[in-house]
Amino acid sequence: MKKHALVTILLFSLICQTAFSAGIDTLKKNGYTLIVSGNDEHFDNAIKEKLISTFFIVYPKIVKEYNKKSLKQVVFFIDTAYHGVAATDNGRVVFSPAYMTKHPNDIDVVTHEVMHITQDYGSFDGPGWLTEGIADYVRNEHGVANDAAKWRLPDYKSTQNYDNAYRITARFLVWVETKVKKGTVKKLDSMMRDHTYTDSTWTKLTGKTVQELWKSYSENPAI
């Protein structure tokens, strides 16, 4: 974890320590509002504080970098009925208390999920693998506790493909950014949001199809 991020999380947790209750917590900072509630009365308050702190660290940065029109108010709900990791819809993020209790250091689940809010692709039927790949790309760039969670982009393997989504796609995107054309990810994100993304988008942005890019990546995947 980056030292300044850790200090910020600890300070924010201390400041807000007495503000959390079993009901609904509404927190405001620098123009952003986070509303936190849930149905698990036994959920670890320390984990909840970290989730909240991470939101106020990463969300404003992501909004500024990717979509300045993104929501200023977000809802977190800790839901015992949800058995995945986390899910986002319409500015509301649902977290699994079972998962977070078992993986208390994986607080950058927040970073991934709030990027989905920032993406705001709406009803666009774009490729889901790219949506998730961009979200993990942003987690890799802006996550505050990836090391603590032992979360990292996987090394390339011949069994992988660009459309495997999540971290595999994210690593490919890092390679495109660093080895092919800087700014590609932001343009892909913007075109997904504007509903102008097509299969030919890769050629327009980089001069190569996504399949050609993947072939080059597979031959020299160092990032």
Residue ranges of predicted features:
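Surface-exposed patches in mature extracellular/periplasmic domains of secreted proteins
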Residues: 63-79, 122-128, 147-154, 173, ...
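Post-HExxH zinc-binding segment in Zn-dependent metallohydrolases
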Residues: 58, 126-169
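Soluble non-cytosolic domains of exported or imported proteins
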Residues: 45-56, 100-109, 125, 129, ...
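Juxtacatalytic substrate-recognition/specificity segment
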Residues: 22-114, 198
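Bacterial Sec-dependent N-terminal signal peptides
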Residues: 1-23
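Pan-zinc metallopeptidase signature
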Residues: 24, 176-223
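Solvent-exposed, polar/charged alpha-helical surfaces in well-ordered, non-transmembrane soluble domains
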Residues: 53-56, 60, 108, 136, ...
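Active-site recognition of the HExxH zinc-binding catalytic motif
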Residues: 108-120, 132-136
